[in-house]
Amino acid sequence: MSLEGKIASQGKAEARAFVTNNPLEKPPFEDYILVTQNSDPEISPLLYNAKGIITEVGGLMSHLAVVSREIKIPCITACENSYDELKTGYNLKIDATAKLNSRVGIEYDF
């Protein structure tokens, strides 16, 4: 199965999904790709151990995109329905090696 979004930070990542909007929620596993609805700065504490980020909103200059480029992890923005469709524990694969702001697919399975 797959979803589509825009590349806001380049790179590749493969890990389990951690779906949350709560910056105080503890990740259930060490390696994860953060899936969130928004790009608010409050979610930042969860970024530094994430292998990648997927968000339903935002763009190249959103907070999550800027921070993800600084810490060199892939970030996909404008990924509609990702928060509802993806569940914590799903296996995700991001290949965001194309140019910034181009459309990219996100592969996932249960």
What are these language model-derived features?
Residues 1-110:
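Non-catalytic, soluble scaffold/interaction modules
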